[in-house]
Amino acid sequence: MNKCEITALFDQWNSALKTGDPKQVAALYAADAILLPTVSNQVRHNHAEIEDYFVHFLAKGPQGVINESNVRIFGDIAINSGVYTFTFKDGVSVQARFTYVYRWDGLGWLITEHHSSAMPE
């Protein structure tokens, strides 16, 4: 696995957002994943909670673009952190910091930790 392949995992996630299907997005997360989302104060601890978050988030029609990416790989764990910008169907854009922690499960890379927080004003 190399940095380009880890960066491409964001493209996979962003493509899942474009489907508008929260189940497809949640499927990219490990069963025991933790999501600290951008536009919710509730920490999500499992697929049901993660899927619930994306039901509401996807209704806004988000499209993400990475502005800065920093990838580190530690065997079967990879981390991608940086800054991304989401543009919503109403034209509003939000820039946020992100961290994705991925774990190789023998079949593919799954998100085990995802933290996203809006940039401070």
Predicted regions: what is each one?
Residues M1-Q24, I34-E121:
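A beta-strand edge to alpha-helix "cap/lid" segment located at domain peripheries
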